[in-house]
Regions:
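C-terminal hydrophobic helical "lid"/dimerization subdomain
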Residues: 201-242
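Glycine-rich phosphate-binding loop and adjacent beta-alpha segment
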Residues: 17, 150-216
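Short amphipathic alpha-helix with an adjacent loop that forms part of the alpha/beta core around
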Residues: 128-138
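Local beta-strand N-terminus motif with an aromatic residue
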Residues: 23, 119, 139-141, 183
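Glycine-rich phosphate/adenylate-binding loop and adjacent beta-alpha elements
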Residues: 1-35
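Mid-domain Rossmann-like dinucleotide-binding core that forms the NAD(H)/NADP(H) cofactor-binding site
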Residues: 46-125
Length: 242
């Protein structure tokens, strides 16, 4: 890299094992960096951040079953935790890829926003946060799950033959109370997504794709810019669910 190059650094446990998560200047390993695409501003890259990198990996994992897309005119994918960072971006990316998206959110006040991102159908979180049947009616060709727990178990029971579920979070619960039925009867694939240590080559590709799949005019409505001095107070409010 040369002085003045636009770069992005997400993941690699920076701010956790390495200092520099929130700072004006940081010293990091060169292999942690990705060259920022010319059609992506510094602010836009941080609006996306780790959530955007995770969301696009989830969306591409679900889309990986190309034979499904060739066989059906309409592909149905469910996204849990759709009001969150990863979930909302996954809704937008999947919609851009031509996929029919069902969004799951416990915040009814966000339903109109999710529709503006491209969600065709909406489900309340409470409808899925219950004990799951071993198999239920096949409703979806794939899923992006950001919450885990009972919600993921219910999603798995509703996936159609050969569907793919990309799982990346545990906000509901880290335990998964399911059976082998979705896997051995319908051939469902559960694909774990970890964007923290994604290879540099893969990151370069994904960051190059993100600007083409994101409508920042919509995302920026949910963005609030704060100063470094406001971090602690903002974190406290987030933990209180405000």
């Amino acid at each position: 890299y040369k002085e003045g190059d636009g770069i992005i650094c997400t993941g690699w446990r920076v701010g956790e094992l390495y200092y520099g998560g929130y700072s004006q200047y940081a010293k990091v390993k060169g292999e942690f960096l990705v060259k920022r695409p010319k059609n992506l501003s510094a602010k836009q890259s941080m609006i996306l951040g780790t959530a955007g990198l995770t969301a696009i990996q989830c969306a591409f994992a679900v889309k990986a079953r190309e034979e499904l897309l060739l066989q059906k005119k309409v592909v149905d994918v469910i996204v849990t935790g759709a009001s969150g960072g990863v979930g909302s971006m996954a809704v937008m990316i999947l919609n851009k890829l031509g996929i029919n998206v069902t969004a799951v959110s416990g915040k009814k006040e966000n339903h109109d926003y999710l529709k503006s991102l491209g969600a065709k159908n909406l489900i309340n979180t409470a409808d899925l946060d219950k004990d799951a049947r071993p198999l239920d009616k096949g409703l979806y060709d794939g899923a992006v799950d950001t919450v885990g727990g009972n919600i993921l178990a219910n999603v798995l029971s509703h996936i159609r033959d050969k569907g793919i579920v990309a799982a990346c979070g545990n906000a509901n619960h880290y335990k998964l109370n399911t059976t082998v039925m979705p896997f051995i009867i319908r051939g469902v694939k559960l694909w774990g997504i970890n964007s923290v240590d994604t290879s540099k080559k893969r990151r370069d590709f994904l960051w190059g794709e993100l600007p083409n799949l994101i409508d920042f005019s919509l995302l920026e409505k949910s963005v609030k810019e704060i100063s470094l001095d406001e971090l602690l107070n903002t974190y406290s409010q987030m933990l209180e669910g405000k």
